[in-house]
């Protein structure tokens, strides 16, 4: 983590449980990020927090540190049953739930608190086996949590800490009724520590905080600009016919260490994957149609560096903590202005620099004015020479004929740069 992203406030300055301090220091966390420095003084006093901060600013560690400290500092409810977790962390997507669980594991190992994970699409019996042995902190998506609760595999009557992560995304995905269903089965808000974190604290998110929290304190960390000042943004205007060749030419020119390419539909993502895989790139595909086990494997391979490029729909745009993403390509400009911010927020995280390259084609260029109004600035435009675009391209692979991530990255150095002056 870049030192420029940190405050002078140290975790050791707070009266945190010694086991929590030890776990943080083992992971190299000594100084707080701004959102952590704002939230921890409140949660350590037992006050509810609704926090707004740009992605990649340490929200996850803020609520995990608070959760572990609270459980270690407060006894469990009397007569607590084995199917009653003490803390519940809700996330909008299974990928985010898995990531939060991974971030929590070092704290769990240091403190002895048991973790559980519940998400749909895969692993029902495996997840249930862990829950049946009893967990202290349950992390999951609302659908699977409700499923387990209705079958009495879990009971929320002993909950002492609740975290709602990416609350605005919960609304976007239509999960608000599920959230309220789960809250109704917990002790009253006055008997819990409640935390809500979101990229935006819109009216509807504040309304949820008012309903389900106990006089929450609002803390906000506003970036200098919505897109982050460490992200270099660039925009091209290709024709529909030249769009794919421009992307492949830019990949050869930029030669990114780790890139995510976003498109608006799964079919477009599959087409991009086919072109890049045929051209020898180590590329993975992440859409809603990819089986859950394969999704997790692809994310793991991308995180480890076994894949250089991930082609994704917006299912991957929120909550994923993938380190060292150097480039984000918007193959399609998104229809939702907020998705532009969330997409390019995959790069330039935690004080690092990043690059965002967007293609404003004939189909999606109309989305640009609203995006620029939302982010508060114009995206710098670059020109290219159509005659210099790559032409020696193989026929794209079909998804049914190959699996994402197969094949080595092209051997040899990147080709010469082809942009016009």
UniProtKB/Swiss-Prot annotation:
UniProt KW keywords: ATP-binding, Cytoplasm, Helicase, Hydrolase, Nucleotide-binding, RNA-binding
Record carries keyword Membrane: no
Cytoplasm as UniProt keyword: yes
Sites where the protein binds ATP: 53-60
Spans annotated as Disordered: 396-421
Annotated Helicase C-terminal domain residues: 245-390
Annotated motif Q motif, positions: 9-37
Complex and partners: Component of the RNA degradosome, which is a multiprotein complex involved in RNA processing and mRNA degradation.
Purpose: DEAD-box RNA helicase involved in RNA degradation. Has RNA-dependent ATPase activity and unwinds double-stranded RNA.
MF terms (GO), sorted A to Z: ATP binding; ATP hydrolysis activity; RNA binding; RNA helicase activity
Compositional bias ranges of the Low complexity kind: 403-414
Any single biological process term in GO: RNA catabolic process
Helicase ATP-binding domain ranges (all copies): 40-219
Protein name: ATP-dependent RNA helicase RhlB
Sequence similarity: Belongs to the DEAD box helicase family. RhlB subfamily.
Enzyme Commission number, as recorded: 3.6.4.13
UniProt lineage: Bacteria, Pseudomonadati, Pseudomonadota, Gammaproteobacteria, Enterobacterales
């Amino acid at each position: 983590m870049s030192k420029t992203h940190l405050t002078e406030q140290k975790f050791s300055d707070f009266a945190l449980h010694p086991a929590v301090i030890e776990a943080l220091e083992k992971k190299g966390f000594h100084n707080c990020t701004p959102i952590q420095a704002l939230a921890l003084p409140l949660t350590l006093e037992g006050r509810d927090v609704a926090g707004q901060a740009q992605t990649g600013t340490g929200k996850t560690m803020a609520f995990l540190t608070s959760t572990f400290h609270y459980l270690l500092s407060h006894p469990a409810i009397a007569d607590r049953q084995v199917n009653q977790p003490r803390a519940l962390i809700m996330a909008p997507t299974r990928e985010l739930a898995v990531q939060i669980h991974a971030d929590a594991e070092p704290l769990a190992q240091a403190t002895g608190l048991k973790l559980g994970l519940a998400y749909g699409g895969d692993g029902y019996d495996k997840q249930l086996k862990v829950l049946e042995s009893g967990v202290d902190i349950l992390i999951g998506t609302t659908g699977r949590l409700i499923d387990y609760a209705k079958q009495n595999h879990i009971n929320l009557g002993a909950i002492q800490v609740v975290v709602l992560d990416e609350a605005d995304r919960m609304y976007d995905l239509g999960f608000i009724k599920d959230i309220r269903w789960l809250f109704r089965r917990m002790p009253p808000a006055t008997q819990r520590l409640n935390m809500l974190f979101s990229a935006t604290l819109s009216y509807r998110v504040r309304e949820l905080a008012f309903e389900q929290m106990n006089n929450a304190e609002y803390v906000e960390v506003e970036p200098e600009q919505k897109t982050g000042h460490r992200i270099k943004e660039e925009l091209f205007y290709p024709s529909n016919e030249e769009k794919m060749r421009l992307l492949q030419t830019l990949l050869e020119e930029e030669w990114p260490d780790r890139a995510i390419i976003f498109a608006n539909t799964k079919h477009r993502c599959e087409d991009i994957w086919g072109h890049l895989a045929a051209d020898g790139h180590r590329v993975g595909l992440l859409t809603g149609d990819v089986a859950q086990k394969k999704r997790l494997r692809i994310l793991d391979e991308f995180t480890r560096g076994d894949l250089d490029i991930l082609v994704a729909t917006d299912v991957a745009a929120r909550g994923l903590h993938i380190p060292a993403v150097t480039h984000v390509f918007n193959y399609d400009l998104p229809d939702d202005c907020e998705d532009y911010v969330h997409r390019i927020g995959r790069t330039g995280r935690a004080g690092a620099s990043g690059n965002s390259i967007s293609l404003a084609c004939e189909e999606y260029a109309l989305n640009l004015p609203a995006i620029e109004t939302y982010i508060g600035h114009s995206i710098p435009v670059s020109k290219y020479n159509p005659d210099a675009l790559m032409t020696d391209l193989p026929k794209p692979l079909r998804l049914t004929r190959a699996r994402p991530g197969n094949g080595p990255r092209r051997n040899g150095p990147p080709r010469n740069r082809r942009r016009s002056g």
